[in-house]
Amino acid sequence: MAQLTREFLLQQEIEVVMEVEESRSKTITTKTYSSIFFGLQFNYIYLGWLVWYLHKDLEKARDYLYLATCIILDMFQRDEQHEAEIGSSLLGLINIHASWHALVANAPDLAVEVMKKTCASNIDQDKNFWWLAGECSIALIEGDESAAQGYCNHILNGPFPSRYAPTLRKNHEPFGKMFQAILDGNLEALEESTLAVARRNQGINTDGMSFYPHIFVLGVLKIAQMYGLEIEKYKPRYPKELLHLPKSDFSHIDRWWERIEIHPA
């Protein structure tokens, strides 16, 4: 079975490379720009996973993740609707697709690099959850617990823009509790908060998010592991609830957990 799976993934790698080459060879017009490059960034992310999982080629995986991030940034900088700023949902998408994948692939230095670039590009910093989450993650990865606590407090308690305050407080709280659990070294609280995020986002799209928080949780767990929290203790129960996602949209996600090396490489 393992050999069949490997052969299947090797074939997938070949097919995705062919898709990438085909997309890159197309004549790009304004009308097709977004669709072509949106597909490219997903393919680069998938290739990053494949080369890491199949060949343990971390350098190539980093290259693919970096390319995916650059494509997203370039695409939205060309988009008239986003020319003035990188909005909240986009910042989240960039951080999720590149930073958290890099974390899970044991490349925290790349994760920090991507987070810093995306956070620096965002104008609406005081209101943006993903900016706060990115800065909090950077601080944790770099060992600055004092700064991390400050960002965590902001995620949990605001200040939030007045007209959005009730909704933002409700939406941010379970995410903030994950960071707080890491800072407190509390495995039980981490498990409770991660499951709360998973349950809250099962099959729904809240604040422009659908499956993104689930990948975000995997990145947070990787940070928790850096702080000595033994996340493998509840591994058998956790993924089943976390990865309850619409099969038609992201059926591959339920296999990602099996590829995560619980112990750092």
Regions found by a protein language model. Name each.
Residues F175, F179-A265:
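Long, ordered, amphipathic alpha-helical scaffolds
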Residues A2-N201:
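Eukaryote-skewed repeat-based solenoidal scaffolds used as protein-protein interaction platforms
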